[in-house]
From Swiss-Prot:
CDD domains: S-100A11. The gene is S100A11. This is Protein S100-A11. Residues 12-47, 52-87 form the EF-hand domain. Facilitates the differentiation and the cornification of keratinocytes.
Amino acid sequence: MSRPTETERCIESLIAVFQKYAGKDGHSVTLSKTEFLSFMNTELAAFTKNQKDPGVLDRMMKKLDLNSDGQLDFQEFLNLIGGLAVACHESFVKAAPPQKRF
């Protein structure tokens, strides 16, 4: 059996992190608001510590909760991860020195 690729390991890691926080308050397939805050303050501590607005995490939760059930399912969680990945990528692109085009 072949070893997982780097991308496959990243996917496994995302699933494991979601499962680590989901279910502590009841539903094992969703993040409650408390679980979401725990995830953000632990796994994305650099992001949360730099926030000046104390309501930003509440607004993020509401925006991510597409079906308005007060929980984040895995798809809604991935929307957060994808948005953060896009923002990080854009920062890297802006910070990279310009490349010569031939």
